[in-house]
C-alpha cells in the first residue's frame, strides 16, 4: 500500500501526509492505510479549493488559468495540510477578521464567500453514517460538513453542496479512480477491512520490488492550492529532489 500511495499521489501531497503522521507519532510505513486515507483527504481538500475565486463584486467564479486576474481573491483558505500551530494561527486570524465563531476542532477550509468553516470527509462507508459521526464530534452548527464517498455519493449540511456540480464531479471521479486502482491491485479490501489490512501489511513487508507493478498515473501538474502552501514547508530544491526520485521510480 505504501508504494501504491507514492505512485498514485502527487509527491507534495505524500510529503504533507508524512509530516502530518509524524506530528502525531505515526509511521507511514506501518500504518499504510491511514497514510493512503490522509493523502486522499488532502487531495480532496485541494481539489475542493482549486480554481475557485471571488471577483471584485463578491461573486464566486471559476478560473482555470495559471495567471488569474489580480483583482481575484481565493474563495477558500486551506487549513488542512498545515502544522497544528500554523493552522490555529490561520483560524484565529480568520475569526478575528470576520467575527465568525472559533471552532473547537481544526476545520479543513474556510469559505470566504459563505463566511463559514468547512469540514471535509472522505469515507469508505455509508456517507450518512460518517456524516453523523462528524456532526456529533464537531457539535457546531457553524461549521459546514461535506462528505464524499468512493462510490460517488455525497452528503452536506442542509444539502448545501457549496461547489458547482462539475467541480464536485471532478472529486468524485478522482475518488472512484483511486478505488479502482486499489481494487485492481488487491488493495481495496485491506483499505476497507482492518483484519484484511493486517494480512496485507505482512505481505507488503515481504515485498522486494517497491516500484514493480504499480500504477504510474499521477498528475505532474502542481495544484494551485498546493502552490500556495509550498513556500511554507518546502523549498524548490526539495521539490526538485522529490520529483526526480518519483520519475526515477517510474522508469524501473
UniProtKB/Swiss-Prot annotation:
Site (Important for efficient shutoff activity and nuclear localization) location in chain: 195, 198-199
Active site residues per record: 80, 108
Site (Important for efficient shutoff activity): residue numbering on this chain: 202-203, 206
Disulphide bridges: none
Any one GO MF annotation of this record: RNA binding
InterPro entries: PA/PA-X, PA/PA-X_sf
Statement: the UniProt record of this protein carries the keyword rRNA-binding: no
Transmembrane parts of this sequence: none
Alphabetical keyword list: Decay of host mRNAs by virus, Eukaryotic host gene expression shutoff by virus, Host cytoplasm, Host gene expression shutoff by virus, Host mRNA suppression by virus, Host nucleus, Host-virus interaction
Pfam families xrefs: Flu_PA
One Gene Ontology biological process: viral RNA genome replication
Coiled coil: none
Protein location: Host cytoplasm; Host nucleus
Function, in words: Plays a major role in the shutoff of the host protein expression by cleaving mRNAs probably via an endonuclease activity. This host shutoff allows the virus to escape from the host antiviral response. Hijacks host RNA splicing machinery to selectively target host RNAs containing introns for destruction. This may explain the preferential degradation of RNAs that have undergone co- or post-transcriptional processing.
Record family assignment: Belongs to the influenza viruses PA-X family.
Domain-related comment: The probable endonuclease active site in the N-terminus and the basic amino acid cluster in the C-terminus are important for the shutoff activity. The C-terminus acts as a nuclear localization signal. The C-terminus is recruited to host protein complexes involved in nuclear Pol II RNA processing.
Protein name in UniProt: Protein PA-X
